[in-house]
């Protein structure tokens, strides 16, 4: 009887352990569904709207077209010049940031082809001229392909054969997601990701500043003591000290994704600049654009204020790459 009792107890313990494992696995599935699927993003966004809170949920379209930009931002970035970059130089800056992440053989392939085009790869590591030289190389590839910046960047990171094939399948000025979909899934996945990263960083590097670059930053990017809610919280942008009614300019060309008001962000504008890059302008007193509008760099899109969860007139400026907030000061030209 004692032996049977022990066996029954062991079976009971095993059953309990299995149930616990099943419960934990179910929790893990629910977490993954909430944080890494489109339905989860939808319900998190809906909850944030109902309770007037912020959310890190990605826009639904990001799950279907922006995967090539998911590489985000490297841990360290080369310093930008204290001036607005030319389009080709900005393109070269993005490539310069992504190149070190390739393995030696891939970099050697890129450098050998650059030599064939008459470039000296040693200049790609020169802090003073690397962005300009890589920009010239990408301009050469763009001209050879008769396509877009996206096609030129695909050419750089995945090679001429892959880029030529993609060009024959899709329209000449197709963006990277369409180019990537035209290639076999196993062909150059890392190179496609780094091409997306380079395009995102080049877009961010080409942006200007929403107000004078010498306006004081009163609250930087990063963790801080929240001024209204208390406790240490992540500050996803920078707060700029500007008086009520200051004209706020779009930092680059793009399409207005949002122009509306809520109790947290106040009257806010979000501009999609392409290549996974968006800029946000919060707490305005007036909005001068509507969702769907196309804006140019320097166009006045709002006037600053203190709407939403705010303690006084200022502009909260936020920059995101691949759906993740980055420090806008990394891309400010004035130092």
Where are these regions (language model features)?
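Extracytoplasmic
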Residues: 94-97, 102, 147-151, 204, ...
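Surface-exposed, glycine-biased beta-strand/turn segments
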Residues: 188-265, 297, 326
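Catalytic glycan-binding domains that act on GlcNAc-containing polysaccharides
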Residues: 47-204
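Conserved positions in beta-strands of structured domains
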Residues: 218, 255-257, 285, 302-305
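Conserved, short, structured surface segments that act as functional micro-motifs
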Residues: 217, 267-273, 293-335
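Hydrophobic membrane-insertion alpha-helices, especially the h-region
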Residues: 18-35
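N-terminal Lys/Arg-rich, disordered targeting/topogenic segments
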Residues: 1-15
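Zn2+-dependent peptidoglycan hydrolase active-site motif and core
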Residues: 233-235, 250-288, 313-315
């Amino acid at each position: 009887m004692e032996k049977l009792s022990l066996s029954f107890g062991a079976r009971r313990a095993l059953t309990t352990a299995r149930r616990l494992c099943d419960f934990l696995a179910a929790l893990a599935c629910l977490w993954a569904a909430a944080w890494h699927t489109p339905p989860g993003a939808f319900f998190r966004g809906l909850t944030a709207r109902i309770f007037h809170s912020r959310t890190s949920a990605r826009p639904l379209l990001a799950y279907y077209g922006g995967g090539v930009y998911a590489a985000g931002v490297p841990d360290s970035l080369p310093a930008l010049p204290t001036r607005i970059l030319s389009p080709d130089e900005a393109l070269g800056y993005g490539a310069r940031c992504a190149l070190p992440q390739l393995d030696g053989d891939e970099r050697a392939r890129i450098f050998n082809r650059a030599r064939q085009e008459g470039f000296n790869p040693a200049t790609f590591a020169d802090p003073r001229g690397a962005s300009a030289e890589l920009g010239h190389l990408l301009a050469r590839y763009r001209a050879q392909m008769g396509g877009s910046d996206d096609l030129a960047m695909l050419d750089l990171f995945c090679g001429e054969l892959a880029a030529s094939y993609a060009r024959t399948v899709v329209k000449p000025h197709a963006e990277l997601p369409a180019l990537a979909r035209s290639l076999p899934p196993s062909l150059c996945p890392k190179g496609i990701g780094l091409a997306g990263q380079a395009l995102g960083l080049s877009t961010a590097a080409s942006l200007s500043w929403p107000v004078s670059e010498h306006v004081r930053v009163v609250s930087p990017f990063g963790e801080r003591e929240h001024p209204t809610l208390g406790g240490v919280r992540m500050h996803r942008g920078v707060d700029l000290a500007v008086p009520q009614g200051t004209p706020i300019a779009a930092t680059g060309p793009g399409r207005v994704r949002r122009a509306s008001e809520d109790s947290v962000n106040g009257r806010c504008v979000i501009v999609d600049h392409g290549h996974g890059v968006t800029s946000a302008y919060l707490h305005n007193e007036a909005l001068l654009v509507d969702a769907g509008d196309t804006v140019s760099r320097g166009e006045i899109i709002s006037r600053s204020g203190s709407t939403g969860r705010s303690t006084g007139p200022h502009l909260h400026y936020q920059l995101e790459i691949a759906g993740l907030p980055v420090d806008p000061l990394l891309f400010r030209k004035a130092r």
